[in-house]
């Protein structure tokens, strides 16, 4: 009994400090919903109650039909898909702690794992159980189980440095190239579900499906780079992009990727809400100003703080675009 109490005590400590369950579960659902709906509504979908609707010309199509539309009820599949995003990101968080435990003992000794307040055994038992539950739910309810397997296979390779730790761990750019694509694979997992469930209404090779693959990928890339850009006086033994390439070049790279990202956003919302396009234009202009300001005076603020604020506002705009479209239609 005492061991069980200790187990849950350690889990509580870990989730509170490293991965708050409630907020991250909501985030997982939001990530799923943004990609799910942005693809569907660009393909002509609407909503009727708790059903996704597509207009049909031929009444011979399989599935429920009502007033000239085909109905696809929302249900357990959508919940499982959102939960999978939450679960997978939780696993990556723990896997990162395992991978970085030696350097964390020096640089982040206050964290739950390096401080000894949480043991590896507890986290291994928990994450093994969580992965098993997630795979079972996908096998039972999801039509795209193979894409779940691909996602978790890639995550497993990340956890062991793709069996090339001696090379990747010492190279920040190589780590970025091998690890950052996981966001693309996560997006493909969601989109594959949309394509399979709503066949033949969703074309996997449409411009909207392809661009949706990069939704949240570019923001994740920008954040990953900018959190490792520092002013020269703030550098430590921790390897950063600013230490490798200089803070000006690293900032320019992040700024270019930000503009590539916003162009994909413009295309995805152009036919849905012109007000959203204007808001996104204002946001990217502000972020560009902050990039240029940081290049001029890197000690004025932490660049990643501005990027996080921009990303929250950007993604909130994308989500509100979906909500407004579903409620009132095109603007």
Where are these regions (language model features)?
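Multi-pass alpha-helical membrane architecture of UbiA-family
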Residues: 1-331
């Amino acid at each position: 009994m005492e061991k069980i109490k200790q187990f849950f005590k350690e889990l509580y400590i870990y989730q509170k400090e490293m991965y708050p369950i409630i907020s991250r579960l909501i985030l997982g659902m939001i990530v799923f919903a943004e990609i799910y709906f942005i693809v569907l509504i660009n393909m002509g979908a609407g909503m009727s109650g708790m059903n996704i609707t597509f207009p049909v010309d031929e009444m011979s199509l399989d599935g429920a039909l009502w007033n000239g539309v085909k109905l696809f009820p929302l249900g357990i599949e959508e919940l499982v898909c959102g939960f999978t995003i939450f679960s997978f990101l939780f696993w990556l968080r723990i896997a990162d702690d395992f991978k970085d435990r030696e350097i964390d003992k020096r640089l982040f000794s206050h964290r739950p794992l390096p401080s000894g307040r949480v043991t590896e055994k507890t986290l291994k038992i928990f994450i093994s159980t969580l992965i098993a539950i997630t795979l079972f739910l996908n096998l039972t309810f999801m039509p795209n189980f193979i894409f779940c397997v691909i996602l978790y296979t890639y995550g497993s390779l990340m956890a062991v440095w793709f069996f090339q730790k001696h090379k990747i761990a010492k190279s920040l750019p190589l780590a970025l190239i091998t690890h950052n694509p996981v966001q693309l694979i996560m997006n493909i997992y969601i989109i594959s579900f949309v394509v399979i469930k709503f066949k033949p209404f969703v074309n996997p090779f449409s411009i909207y499906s392809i661009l949706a693959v990069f939704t949240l990928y570019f923001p994740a890339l920008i954040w990953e780079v900018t959190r490792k850009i520092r002013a020269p006086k703030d550098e430590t033994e921790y390897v950063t992009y600013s230490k490798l390439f200089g803070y000006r070049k690293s900032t320019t790279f992040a700024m270019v990727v930000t503009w590539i990202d916003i162009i994909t956003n413009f295309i995805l919302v152009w036919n849905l809400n012109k007000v959203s396009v204007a808001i996104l234009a204002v946001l990217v202009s502000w972020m560009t100003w902050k990039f240029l300001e940081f290049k001029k005076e890197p000690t004025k603020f932490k660049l990643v703080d501005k990027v996080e604020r921009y990303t929250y506002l950007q993604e909130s705009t994308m989500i509100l675009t979906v909500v407004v479209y579903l409620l009132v239609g095109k603007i």
